[in-house]
Design a protein with these regions (language model features):
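Active-site proximal loop and beta-alpha junction motif in alpha/beta enzyme cores
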Residues: 1-30, 34-215
Length: 215
């Protein structure tokens, strides 16, 4: 399995911070956890309470709350879709399928998400989507997920903030709550708290650990 994660490039010009995110094989169009890590570094270095990153995909706002960081992200509408024929045999257990930037398979249980076996070669063939996400309800207060994006060099991501743009609005509606927790069942595990901010945005709360930094 190839390593997960992103490399974040930040520039500071005309009083503004600009950010771009890259994986091994390409540029990421929005990286939530990468933004959290970059924001944590900037907030610490400049002793700020919040920071706005400008990107070609819009503004990303990072703030600190106790020992966590908050990230305001867009809320993406779930659109019903068919399972691409290339991965139809991977989705035989799916109880729902929808698309946003990503293709999302809703599975019947936490165990089904844990046991899901991806195929990188076939996932690369469905390049109309940024990634494949598998998800399931985790009781009445949250959901679990796994995130696969081999098209940009990420076999399985460890912690994916931007995946909540696809998943949180869906689970807000299904579970009847505007505040949920999300667990990413990757090798190292990821944990998020998500809240509905407006009809068009969510707030993601998470901790951040930086592996390397150069400012």
């Amino acid at each position: 399995m190839r390593p997960s994660g992103s490399t974040n490039f930040i520039t500071h010009a005309d009083g503004q911070f600009h950010i771009r995110w890259f994986a091994l094989d390409g540029e990421i169009n929005l990286c939530g956890h990468g933004s959290l890590g970059a924001g944590a570094a900037i907030l610490s270095k400049y002793q700020l309470e919040s920071v706005v990153f400008n990107s070609k995909y819009g503004e990303v706002v990072i703030s600190k709350r106790d020992d966590q960081y908050s990230l305001v992200l867009p809320s993406w509408e779930a659109k019903p879709c068919a399972v691409p024929v290339e991965i139809s045999d991977l989705a035989t257990d799916a109880i729902d399928v929808f698309s946003t930037r990503d293709l999302v398979l809703v599975l019947p249980s936490v165990e089904a998400v844990m046991n899901f076996q991806p195929d990188d070669d076939r996932l690369r063939e469905i390049n109309e989507y940024h990634a494949l996400i598998v998800t399931a309800a985790n009781g009445n207060s949250g959901y679990v997920l796994r995130y696969f994006a081999p098209q940009i060099g990420i076999s399985e991501d460890l912690a994916t903030g931007s995946a909540q743009c696809s998943l949180a609005p869906y689970w807000f509606k299904k579970l009847g709550s505007d505040a949920l927790n999300a667990r990413q069942l990757s090798m190292s595990g990821g944990y998020f708290e998500v809240e509905r901010t407006t009809e068009n945005s969510i707030t993601v709360f998470a901790q951040s650990k930086r592996r390397a930094i150069a400012i």
